[in-house]
Amino acid sequence: MHWELRVLQQRLERLSAHHPEAWAPPIDVYETEKAFIVTAELPGLNRDQIELAFEDRRLTIRGHRSDRSASGDVLRFHQVERGHGSFVRSFEFADKIEVEHVAADLVDGVLTITLPKVPPAPSRKIEVL
């Protein structure tokens, strides 16, 4: 059921992305043995336009790309394909995350977030008394 809800959420996000006022950046989420990695294409955004939060195993990415006509210049667009405005994307992780070691880096318009997993507790032998 959780998977079905995620698929539905992705479909809704794609539909809203085709609305001229909506913008949702493409994001990949993958997993290694030790961490989850999230990459988001955010061309034209700087660090001040991106907000990250992690709470209750949920990563939330918020951002805002300004409308190019907000500069005050009169612009006559011939074609507009790049969206603008605010976006919010959230991702929930099943494994526990070492929140104090989460790292984010923005290079060439690609945001990379590394979320290290909490290592499993070592097994121990329990003596029967």
Regions found by a protein language model. Give the residues of each.
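Short proline/glycine- and polar residue-rich coil/turn motifs
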Residues: 81-85
